[in-house]
C-alpha cells in the first residue's frame, strides 16, 4: 500500500509536466543555491525513500520535473537528466545517511591502524579488524568484497560492462602524541574515539582517510539502492600502508590489474593533478659518553610522532650541573626569545620547569601536515634555537650536535634557503624541508626532516645535494654526521576530457567555488596508479588537519563529500568515454 501511495504522490507531483519531452539535455541543472534551498525544505522527505524525496524535490523546483519524470519512467538518463538525478541522489544520501556515516567513521577511528614496529601491517590485528569492518559493511550494502591478503580491501559495485574505474583511499593512520590532544578550553580528547565538538569531528583518521572511506561506502550503497544503472564497475581499493610508503599497493599491483582511470580521495578539492615528491632526510650523531661531573647535558629530546607531521610540542630534558641556575637562566631568557621569533612564523610558547635533578623545556607551537609547514609553527627548531641562544653551556653529546645542526642549517626556515637548496616551480610551489622528529636509536641521535620536492629537480640530484651540504657543514663544524636521504619523485599529469571536467563541474556546482585543477604538496598513492587524480577531501581555503594533533573533519565538509562522491560515482560510472 505504501508503494502505491508513493507512486500516486509522484504522479501527482509530475502531472504538470507529463507532456514535456524526456530528452531534456538543454533544460539545465540545479546548482548550489537550488540545492541549498532543497536541503532547507526537504530534511523530513529524506527520511523516506529516494522516490518520495524526488517527488518532493520536483514539487519544490520545476527545473527538476522532467528529470524526475524520466527517472520514474525508468528511461535511460543522459545529459542534464543524469546530472540532476545524480545530484539529487547525492543530496538524499547526505540527508538520509549523515548519522550513519558519522557512526561508521567512529567505528573506523576506534581501530588504531598505526603501523607497528615489530608486526608487518598485513599481520597486524588492527588492520585485520579494519578489513572485517569493511567486509561487514559491504555485505550489508549488497556490494562485492575481496580481501587481497590484508594489503588491500576491495569493494565493488558492478556495472553492466567489464570496464572499471577505481576509487582509492587508505585505512592506515599516522601515530599520535596523546598529550597534545587537548582543546583550548582544556578538554582532553582520545585520539581514537571520534568526538564531536560543535561542528567538528575529532579523531585520528577523521579526515585522513577514514571519513572518506565511510562516505564513499555509503555513496556506493545509495547508488545501488537507487536502481540507477552503471556502465562501469566501481572498484573501491582501501590501502593499508599509504602513510609508510605504499608497500601494500605495490603488492596489489603485482597481483591485480589496475583500472585504467582512478580517483583518489586523499588530498584536496577541486582536482589534484600534480604532487610533490615526499622524502625523509636523516642526519645522525653519535650519542657519546655521559657528561662529566658538573656539566649540563641534554639527555632527551622529542618532536613529532612521525616524520610527516609538524609537531605541536617539542621537549628537551637537561641534567647535570646546577639545575636551579639552568632553570633560572632559561626562564629569564624565554620572554625575549619568544618576542624575537614570533614574527618568523607565528606565536609559540616556552615552559621551563625544574623536576628534581632535571630541567624540562617544552616549546609549544602549532601542528600541521608535514607537506604544509607554512600552516604550522614548528616547535622543534625553535627549541634548538632557544637552547643555543640561552647561553647555557651544554656538554657536547649527540643531542648538542643535533641542536647545532638544527640551528645552523634550518632555524625557522623550511624552504631550504639556509642549506642553499631553495627552488620553486610556478605551479607546484617551493621545495620544503621541515625538521619534525628527533629520536634516540641504536646509540645515535637522529634528526628526521620531511622533504617535499616539486618539479625542477630529481630525487637523485636533490639527495646528492643535501648529503653534500650536510657533510660539508659537519666537516666545517667538526661534527661527525651520518646522512641518509630517501627521496620520492614528484608527479605532474595533464588529464583532459570528460572525467576531469565531470569532477570539476561536480565540485563547482556543489560548492559555488572556483573549480580548476590544482597541485598539492602532499604525496599520495596516486603516483602508483595509472591516470589517477585526487578528488578531496580537504576544502580550499581551510587548514588541512591530517597528521595534526587534534585532527578533525568538519561535519559540513563530510556532508559535501557524501553529496559529491555520490554524484561522481553515477556520472563517471556512465560516461560514454573518459577522455
List PLM regions with ranges.
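Positively charged n-region of N-terminal signal peptides that target proteins for export
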Residues: 1-4
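C-terminal motif of bacterial Sec signal peptides marking the signal peptidase cleavage site
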Residues: 14-16
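An extended, acidic, His-containing surface patch that forms the Zn2+-binding/catalytic region
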Residues: 20-35, 364-448, 452-468, 473-579
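Alpha-helical metal-binding/catalytic segments enriched in His/Glu/Asp
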Residues: 167, 195-244, 282-289, 314-324, ...
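Acidic-glycine-rich active-site phosphate/pyrophosphate-binding loop
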Residues: 179-196, 285-287, 292, 353-363, ...
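Acidic/histidine-rich catalytic neighborhood of metal-dependent amide-processing enzymes
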Residues: 209-288, 331, 335, 413-427
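Short, conserved charged micro-motifs
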Residues: 291-293, 322-330, 372, 456-464
